[in-house]
Amino acid sequence: MNIFKQTCVGAFAVIFGATSIAPTMAAPLNLERPVINHNVEQVRDHRRPPRHYNGHRPHRPGYWNGHRGYRHYRHGYRRYNDGWWYPLAAFGAGAIIGGAVSQPRPVYRAPRMSNAHVQWCYNRYKSYRSSDNTFQPYNGPRRQCYSPYSR
């Protein structure tokens, strides 16, 4: 087993080494030099900045990235908060859905059939299954077995 492990490790090392070299060999070599165009002149804009400009945007309180809010009042919106509108119904719906999802699934117990009922169904139908009290007719899907002993 030890020889097999060493052979596999060696094979993987060769494979990984070969695949890491292949992409570098596939890249073309760019031996051309870029053409320098001497006919281009650098132009500078000599306009003066505005009078009280310090290089930054001015502070505008109440605006978040230029958003000035809604034009008309919206229900559930409160001034001087984070700028978003959160109706109470959204939180209520989330709580209801979360509560419904977290509920455990109901466990249904199969009704206990009497031994006489099970024996009667086994005698009547060859394809009877006592685990779910069904039999397979010649035509159609499985059906439930009803006997004179069933409750």
Curated annotation (Swiss-Prot):
Keywords: Cell membrane, Lectin, Membrane, Signal, Transmembrane, Transmembrane helix, Virulence. Has immunoglobulin-binding and hemagglutination properties, and can bind to mannose. Essential for virulence. May be involved in LPS biosynthesis or polysaccharide transport. This is Lectin-like protein BA14k. GO terms for molecular function: carbohydrate binding. One of its GO terms (cellular component) is plasma membrane. Belongs to the BA14k family. It comes from Brucella anthropi (strain ATCC 49188 / DSM 6882 / CCUG 24695 / JCM 21032 / LMG 3331 / NBRC 15819 / NCTC 12168 / Alc 37). Residues 1-26 form the signal peptide. The chain crosses the membrane at residues 83-103. Its main location: membrane. Coiled coil: none annotated. It is found in: Cell membrane. It is a single-pass membrane protein.
